[in-house]
C-alpha cells in the first residue's frame, strides 16, 4: 500500500480542527493512501484533534503534544513526505526535525513535497527558500511566490526557482489552475469545470493531496498537476471539507472538461 507522511501543525478553533496540511492528510487517506500525521497539536484539544485524524483514517501515533518536541519517526517507511511551512516555522525544534527529514529523504530518494503556505514575515523568506531547495516538489501559491522572489509572472517565477536549484515547482493560480515546471517539462494546467461552487475552503488541501498522490505514483508532473486541479474542483462542490475517493476522482476527470477561465465562480 502507498504510504505518505504529513508534517503539519493542528489546532482547534472551537468549531473545526484547523491547520495547514491537516485536511491534506484526510484527503490522501480518502484516496486510499496509508497516511500518518507527524503533527504538533494544541494540548488543550488533543482528544478532539486525534479523533479527527482517526475518523478520517489518518494514523495519529506520531503526533506530538504542544509542549513535546520529540518526534520519533523515520521517513524510510513512506513513499512521500509532505511538509508545510507552518510546521517548519513553528519553532526551532520543528525546523530542525523537518530539515532532518528532508536530508534523510534525499539519501533514501523519497520525494518531499513542500508547501510554504502563508509564511508571514520577511525574515522567514530565506528559511522557505532553503526548504524549497531541499524538496522534490515546491508548491507555492502565486502570491507567496511573488513575495519570495519579487517577480510576478508564473513562468518567470518558475524559471527563477529552477535556476536556484529547485527540482520541480508547481505554482497554484486559484481558478486559473496551476503553472508547473521541471527540468524536462513545463506548462500551465487549466482546471476543470465545476457543476456548482458551494464552498472553496478545502480546495487547497485537495489540490495538495492530488499532487502528492501523483508524486507517489511517479506519474509525470504535468499529469499530477492535472489530477491536483481535478481534486480541487471536486472539493469546492460540497459544503465543508469534502474529498473524493480515487475512483470518484477518476470518474470526474473522465466526465468533465477543462476550462481556461476557471471553475465558474471559484
Give residue ranges: language-model regions.
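Rossmann-fold NAD(P)-dependent oxidoreductase module
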Residues: 27, 52, 104, 210, ...
Amino acid at each position: 500500500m502507498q504510504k505518505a507522511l504529513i508534517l503539519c501543525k493542528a489546532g482547534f478553533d472551537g468549531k473545526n480542527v484547523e491547520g495547514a496540511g491537516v485536511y491534506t492528510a484526510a484527503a490522501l487517506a480518502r484516496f486510499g493512501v496509508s497516511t500518518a500525521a507527524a503533527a504538533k497539536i494544541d494540548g488543550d484539544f488533543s482528544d478532539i484533534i486525534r479523533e479527527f485524524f482517526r475518523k478520517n483514517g489518518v494514523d495519529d501515533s506520531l503526533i506530538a503534544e504542544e509542549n513535546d518536541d520529540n518526534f520519533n519517526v523515520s521517513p524510510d517507511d513512506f513513499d512521500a513526505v509532505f511538509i508545510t511551512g507552518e510546521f517548519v516555522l513553528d519553532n526551532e525544534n520543528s525546523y530542525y526535525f523537518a530539515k532532518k527529514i528532508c536530508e534523510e529523504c534525499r539519501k533514501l530518494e523519497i520525494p518531499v513535497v513542500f508547501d510554504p503556505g502563508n509564511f508571514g514575515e520577511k525574515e522567514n523568506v530565506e528559511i522557505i527558500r532553503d526548504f524549497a531547495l531541499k524538496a522534490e516538489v515546491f508548491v507555492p501559491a502565486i502570491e507567496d511566490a511573488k513575495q519570495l522572489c519579487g517577480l510576478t509572472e508564473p513562468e518567470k517565477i518558475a524559471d527563477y526557482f529552477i535556476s536556484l536549484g529547485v527540482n520541480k515547482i508547481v505554482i497554484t493560480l486559484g481558478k486559473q489552475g496551476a503553472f508547473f515546471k521541471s527540468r524536462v517539462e513545463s506548462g500551465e494546467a487549466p482546471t476543470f469545470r465545476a457543476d456548482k461552487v458551494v464552498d472553496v475552503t478545502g480546495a487547497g488541501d485537495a489540490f495538495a493531496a492530488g499532487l502528492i498522490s501523483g508524486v507517489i505514483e511517479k506519474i509525470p508532473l504535468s499529469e499530477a498537476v492535472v489530477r491536483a486541479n481535478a481534486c480541487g474542483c471536486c472539493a469546492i462542490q460540497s459544503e465543508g471539507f469534502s474529498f473524493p475517493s480515487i475512483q470518484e476522482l477518476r470518474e470526474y476527470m473522465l466526465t468533465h472538461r477543462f476550462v481556461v477561465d476557471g471553475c465558474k465562480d471559484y
